[in-house]
Amino acid sequence: ADVPGNYPLNTYGNMYYCTILGENEFCKKICKVHGVSYGYCYNSYCWCEYLEGKDINIWDAVKNHCTNTNLYPNGK
């Protein structure tokens, strides 16, 4: 069964380019920033499993998931 997901987008609205296909630490970190726990390099771009539409864009993901008290002193 195919796991749903999406290609996350960076601050420029572009997909994250990756060179090591499959298991990829960079992509895992990117996917965590976008609010999901796992991703990998597919077709030279990071793919995040279970990444929802609302979190594809990095700015949306930060708004939805960031817990930085300097950015959000009163929480969310």
Swiss-Prot record:
GO terms for cellular component: extracellular region. Its main location: secreted. It is found in: Secreted. This is Toxin Acra III-2. Residues 3-67 form the LCN-type CS-alpha/beta domain. Disulfide bonds join C18-C41, C27-C46, C31-C48. It comes from Androctonus crassicauda. Pfam families: Toxin_3. Has the structural arrangement of an alpha-helix connected to antiparallel beta-sheets by disulfide bonds (CS-alpha/beta). It comes from the Eukaryota. CDD domains: neurotoxins_LC_scorpion. InterPro entries: LCN-type_CS_alpha_beta_dom, Scorpion_toxin-like_sf, Scorpion_toxinL/defensin. Belongs to the long (3 C-C) scorpion toxin superfamily. Sodium channel inhibitor family. Beta subfamily. The lineage of its organism: Eukaryota, Metazoa, Ecdysozoa, Arthropoda, Chelicerata. Keywords: Disulfide bond, Ion channel impairing toxin, Neurotoxin, Secreted, Toxin, Voltage-gated sodium channel impairing toxin. Binds to sodium channels (Nav) and affects the channel activation process. Expressed by the venom gland. GO terms for molecular function: sodium channel inhibitor activity; toxin activity.
